[in-house]
């Protein structure tokens, strides 16, 4: 394994135009940096023959993530870390070396951040739009994916399982289940229609989280997207849902047009609105785990936000740690049975 690691590190060193790798040693990594995907992730300190040192991240990644990173590296890795893997064939987890961006995730105060993220994301999306035939390693978010996987196994099934296991959860949240199933099914139909439509299909990240999430780093003044473990050939709209409000999404639309994409704004608006529920569904399971045993006043902040998004399609604050004012409002709605009602807060 050690010899293999050196070969992989050398491959990345060549991409980054460094020297010859002399040896590797284990570096320090926090749990937060390692992430919560369950993948094996390490930081290794690299010493080159010229005496220079730097660190690299090693991740045991699935084929689709290794290939996504290879594709983005080959395209110039302007807003993704450079990466290298020896194995770009085996459909099993294999080691990949990744450029270490450090631990600074947020830009300093005063940086106009959203336009930079918009520009970078639009560049990645348009570069890979409608290239499904060239990316045979990338799974497709087709009707089967949405209906039999994302709205069931990934999300609402976890809700139903906890209802079966925890009578307290069932009493408090069980009334939401029929509407959750109904709204998520409508969402799946919309996404399946976008797959058939084809125009918006591209290499998507799928797990960009929100501005206080962990998958967009501030590095050398630019946004860098990391952790492509949830990548799919899917509508680009799902990458906008968690991170951008409608005003920022309009900046993204303008970037699409500047990159030569032909799309009416009314059509863009309709499709991005339909995609908002993606965030509620993709993060429903983590929010249920966070609720744990309750009470909702202490552990239900994330869960109420995800339920609000799925039940109404509204997305008032794009933050994991959203405001206490909004939490109080959602708690009140939850207690008086109006969480499922529209408030007009679609931003």
Name the predicted role of every residue range.
Residues 282-347:
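ATP/Mg2+ or Mg2+-diphosphate-binding catalytic cores
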Residues 203, 217-262:
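Active-site Asp-x-Gly
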Residues 203-206, 210:
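Catalytic-loop of the protein kinase fold
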Residues 1-94, 192, 196-202, 217-223, ...:
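Conserved NTP-binding catalytic cores of kinases and kinase-like/nucleotidyltransferase enzymes
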């Amino acid at each position: 394994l050690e010899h293999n690691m050196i070969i992989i590190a050398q491959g990345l060193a060549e991409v980054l135009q460094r020297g010859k790798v002399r040896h590797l040693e284990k570096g320090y990594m926090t749990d937060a940096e390692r992430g919560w995907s369950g993948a094996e992730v390490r930081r290794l300190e690299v010493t080159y023959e010229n005496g220079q040192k730097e660190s690299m991240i090693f991740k045991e990644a699935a084929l689709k993530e290794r290939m996504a990173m290879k594709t983005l590296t080959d395209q110039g890795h302007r807003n993704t870390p450079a990466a290298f893997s020896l194995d770009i064939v085996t459909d099993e987890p294999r080691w990949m070396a990744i450029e270490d961006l450090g631990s600074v995730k947020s830009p300093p105060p005063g940086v106009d951040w959203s336009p930079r993220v918009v520009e970078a994301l639009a560049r990645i999306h348009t570069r890979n739009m409608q290239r499904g035939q060239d990316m045979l390693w990338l799974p497709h978010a087709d009707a089967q994916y949405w209906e039999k996987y994302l709205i069931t196994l990934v999300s609402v099934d976890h809700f139903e399982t906890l209802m079966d296991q925890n009578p307290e959860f069932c009493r408090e949240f069980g009334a939401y289940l029929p509407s959750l199933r109904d709204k998520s099914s409508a969402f799946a139909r919309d996404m399946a229609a976008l797959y058939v439509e084809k125009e918006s299909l591209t290499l998507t990240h799928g797990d960009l989280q929100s501005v206080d999430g962990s998958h967009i780093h501030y590095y050398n003044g630019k946004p860098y997207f990391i952790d492509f473990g949830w990548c799919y050939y899917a509508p680009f709209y799902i990458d906008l849902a968690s991170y951008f409000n409608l005003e920022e999404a309009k900046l993204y639309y303008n970037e699409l047009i500047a990159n030569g994409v032909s799309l009416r704004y009314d059509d863009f608006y309709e499709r991005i609105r339909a995609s908002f529920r993606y965030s509620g569904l993709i993060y429903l399971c983590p929010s249920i785990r966070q609720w744990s045993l309750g009470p909702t006043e202490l552990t239900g902040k994330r869960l109420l936000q995800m339920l609000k998004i799925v039940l109404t399609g509204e997305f008032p604050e794009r933050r994991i740690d959203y405001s206490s004012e909004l939490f109080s409002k959602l708690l009140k709605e939850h207690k008086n049975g109006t969480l499922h009602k529209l408030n007009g807060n679609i931003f």
